[in-house]
Amino acid sequence: MLCSIYKSSKKEGTYLYIPKKDDFSQVPDTLMQMFGKPSHVMTVNLEGRSLALVNIEKVKESLSNEGFFLQLPPPPENLLQQHKERKAQQKND
């Protein structure tokens, strides 16, 4: 299964996967407005490979059912909260 991957011009770390290069017909207009001008990153064959930040099966399922897959950036690390949790755990030990 081939798909083309585009990065967002408005949302850093956000990528849109579609089955056919430059065919955004299945992507809702509101999503395209929020996504901004898509910039083609690459076209890949999803068969027999893995992706770094997303589950390949979810990508394939979404491409088949929805006609696109939207990859959002991971949530930012809350280092302060992690530090507080470690300190609290150290007090309890």
UniProtKB/Swiss-Prot annotation:
Residues 74-93 are annotated as: Disordered. InterPro entries: YcgL-like_sf, YcgL_dom. Pfam families: YcgL (PF05166). Residues 1-84 form the YcgL domain. It comes from the Bacteria. This is YcgL domain-containing protein VV1058.
